[in-house]
């Protein structure tokens, strides 16, 4: 009898991995561990602010130089300390140098297959929008892009990323605190948008109306 447990167990482990990574991101954004979230938030903001002030080549160069300054200084310090104390503790980074940090083929294939599934889903949705499978959805995209032309005239990409990070690390906390009130207003907006959409669909020609429904 053929063993069919392989693909199924692989799918289950992949789903579990996605749920685990999703929970980790959620914990970061909800500040479950203040120290860890603070480090990620601070590091991301420093990187984005650096990219806003300098070119990406300069930022990468400064990051590499900073890291080398720390590791070289520590390496020289430990060597001098061993010479003064006449000890032979060996290379200070020996445990890290001996650690296996190679990326396994299974992990790479799993990440690739997961990414490919998301890319294919996004491509299919983009094709539907541009080929007007649903007229209302395509009109929503056109309206969004029209609004983005005004946003792009005021903000550049890095500024939008900075605002996005600020929102990502503050909005979940605000939502968690005022969940009932926010859900109430979101429901009102959703009902209003749905009402407008239904009015637009009612005025569409017969063929387009059927397609959008």
Swiss-Prot record:
The chain crosses the membrane at residues 45-65, 154-174. It comes from the Eukaryota. It is a multi-pass membrane protein. Its main location: endoplasmic reticulum. The keyword Ribonucleoprotein does not apply. Residues 1-16 have a biased composition (Polar residues). May be involved in membrane trafficking in the early secretory pathway. This is Reticulon-3. It comes from Xenopus tropicalis.
């Amino acid at each position: 009898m053929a063993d069919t447990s392989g693909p199924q167990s692989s799918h289950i482990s992949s789903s579990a991995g996605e749920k685990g990574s999703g929970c980790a991101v959620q914990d970061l954004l909800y500040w479950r561990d203040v120290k860890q979230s603070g480090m990620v938030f601070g590091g991301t903001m420093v990187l984005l602010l650096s990219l806003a002030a300098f070119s990406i080549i300069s930022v990468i160069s400064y990051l590499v130089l900073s890291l080398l300054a720390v590791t070289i200084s520590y390496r020289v310090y430990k060597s001098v300390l061993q010479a003064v104390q006449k000890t032979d503790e060996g290379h200070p980074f020996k445990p890290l140098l001996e650690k296996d940090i190679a990326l396994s083929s299974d992990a790479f294939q799993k990440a690739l297959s997961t990414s490919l599934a998301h890319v294919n889903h996004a491509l299919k949705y983009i094709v539907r929008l541009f080929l007007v499978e649903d007229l209302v959805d395509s009109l929503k995209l056109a309206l969004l892009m029209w609004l983005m032309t005004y946003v792009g005239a005021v903000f550049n990409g890095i500024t939008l990323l900075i605002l996005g990070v600020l929102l990502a690390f503050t909005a979940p906390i605000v939502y968690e605190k005022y969940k009932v009130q926010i859900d109430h207003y979101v429901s009102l907006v959703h009902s209003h948008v749905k009402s407008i959409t239904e009015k637009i669909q009612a005025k569409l020609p017969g063929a387009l109306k059927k397609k959008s429904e």
